[in-house]
């Protein structure tokens, strides 16, 4: 007799290497707790609807919990020839409790069973990701609050542009993560839907109660179409997209961490706990954790593209191609969770080199816009002021000095409206404090940002 759940139709058994190719047990065992959870809900509903007896239901629940406990204690042997975690559990259940275990699958197909497991898994992991993002946001905010008055060069085109505060810069990543978190939160509306009871594709003749299992599994909604229930993988694509975009944001942050920690910048010092050395160069301290996060974006984005390509040509309803929805999602979730934990620890433990940042911003031309604004405030049209300042910058470069060192007579030869107060005006800390527009880098604006953030984080 075949050990296949579908073996009655077949006169030949697949060879072991075919079983290996077909099997998903080596990765879908990740779903075991959700499979047990879904099966217990299904059994309770079957008993409530008098489709199975209360005695059978009790045996099923006791057996499923025992199987899960054995798995968690590494006492459950999984069989590749049984294909997946779902059939492994069913086979083990029947072996332990007999015919009662064989009644569990009444009114259910692996199609809606697997879909239910995946919805439960994705819902749980998205909520876990939201918590990790929030935790990282707290770390960013704590760092920002310590550096509201720390001045650094702001960049465009990786060229120094204008003085900003370190707090303003790092809070940019808070807002990126806030959008990421919002996308994950919104996606729960499309994840938190029960497909259980859709069966293979057309529903079932048994008098099941899909709303009962929805309630037992704490789903907020239920699929209205049984074919849509078993063929929908939009929520997986959406989750992979949200993971990929979050990883892109972490990659951008990682790139800055790598640059900031270089000897050329020396803006920050990373903790030894988040750095590695060289096997040949004993002086090296490498930002490997940041580099790994930057590199893993290709991995998560690849999973997104793979899922889209898997779905693009599939007819309704279920197709075996959909088995490919799991490994990419599991790996993407694992990758983002690890990246968030690493980044949180890396930022929490880094040292901001305040004096180096101040030295850098004093030794550049990032205050040139302020000189133009100074002239505008004296009635010079901005375009004319821009031209004057450009010539002063060129003269300064030719004489190897910065704007704070330009002699007053040189300023006045460029424009007679420039007075001795220009030197105080051009100090980087004053450039920053004069930024008063909403959302700007000025201390009052940054504090306003932080007040808004604290309210959001406490809600």
Swiss-Prot record:
Its EC number is 4.3.2.1. GO terms for cellular component: cytosol. GO terms for biological process: arginine biosynthetic process via ornithine; L-arginine biosynthetic process. Pathway: Amino-acid biosynthesis; L-arginine biosynthesis; L-arginine from L-ornithine and carbamoyl phosphate: step 3/3. It catalyses: 2-(N(omega)-L-arginino)succinate = fumarate + L-arginine. Pfam families: ASL_C2, Lyase_1. GO terms for molecular function: argininosuccinate lyase activity. Keywords: Amino-acid biosynthesis, Arginine biosynthesis, Cytoplasm, Lyase. Gene3D superfamilies: Fumarase/aspartase (C-terminal domain), Fumarase/aspartase (Central domain), Fumarase/aspartase (N-terminal domain). It is found in: Cytoplasm. Belongs to the lyase 1 family. Argininosuccinate lyase subfamily. NCBIfam families: argH (TIGR00838). This is Argininosuccinate lyase. It comes from Staphylococcus saprophyticus subsp. saprophyticus (strain ATCC 15305 / DSM 20229 / NCIMB 8711 / NCTC 7292 / S-41).
């Amino acid at each position: 007799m075949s050990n296949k759940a579908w073996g009655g139709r077949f006169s030949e058994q697949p060879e072991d290497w075919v079983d290996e190719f077909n099997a998903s047990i080596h990765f879908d065992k990740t779903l075991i707790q959700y499979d047990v959870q879904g099966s217990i809900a299904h059994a309770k509903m079957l008993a409530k609807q008098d489709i199975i007896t209360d005695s059978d239901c009790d045996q099923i629940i006791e057996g499923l919990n025992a199987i899960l406990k054995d798995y968690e204690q590494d006492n459950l042997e999984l069989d590749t020839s049984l294909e997946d975690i779902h059939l492994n559990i069913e086979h083990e259940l029947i072996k332990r409790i007999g015919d009662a275990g064989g009644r569990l699958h009444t009114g259910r197909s692996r199609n809606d069973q697997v879909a239910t497991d995946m919805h439960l898994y994705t819902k749980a992991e998205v909520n876990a990701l939201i918590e990790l993002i929030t935790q990282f946001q707290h770390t960013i905010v704590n760092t920002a609050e310590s550096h509201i008055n720390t001045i650094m060069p702001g960049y465009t085109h990786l060229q120094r542009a204008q003085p900003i505060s370190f707090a303003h810069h790092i809070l940019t990543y808070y807002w990126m993560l806030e959008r990421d978190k919002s996308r994950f939160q919104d996606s729960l509306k499309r994840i938190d839907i029960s497909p259980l009871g859709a069966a293979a594709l057309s529903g079932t003749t048994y008098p099941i109660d899909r709303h009962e299992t929805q309630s037992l599994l704490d789903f907020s909604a239920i699929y209205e179409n049984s074919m849509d229930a078993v063929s929908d993988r939009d929520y997986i694509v959406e989750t992979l997209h949200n993971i990929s975009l979050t990883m892109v944001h972490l990659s951008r942050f990682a790139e800055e961490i790598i640059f900031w920690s270089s000897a050329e910048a020396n803006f920050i010092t990373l903790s030894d706990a988040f750095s590695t050395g060289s096997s040949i160069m004993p002086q090296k301290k490498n930002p490997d954790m940041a580099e790994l996060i930057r590199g893993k974006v290709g991995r998560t984005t690849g999973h997104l593209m793979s899922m889209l390509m898997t779905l693009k040509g599939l007819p309704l309803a279920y197709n075996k191609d959909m088995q490919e929805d799991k490994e990419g999602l599991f790996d993407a979730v694992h990758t983002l969770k690890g990246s968030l934990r690493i980044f949180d620890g890396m930022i929490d433990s880094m040292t901001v080199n305040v004096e180096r940042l101040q030295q850098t911003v004093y030794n550049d031309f990032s205050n040139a816009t302020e000189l133009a604004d100074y002239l505008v405030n004296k009635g010079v049209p901005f375009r004319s002021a821009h031209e004057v300042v450009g010539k002063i910058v060129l003269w300064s470069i030719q004489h190897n000095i910065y704007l704070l060192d330009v002699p007053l007579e040189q300023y006045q030869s460029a424009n007679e409206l420039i007075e001795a107060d220009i030197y105080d005006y051009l100090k980087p800390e004053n450039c920053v404090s004069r930024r008063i527009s909403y959302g700007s880098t000025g201390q009052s604006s940054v504090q306003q940002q932080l007040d808004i953030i604290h309210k959001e984080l406490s809600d």
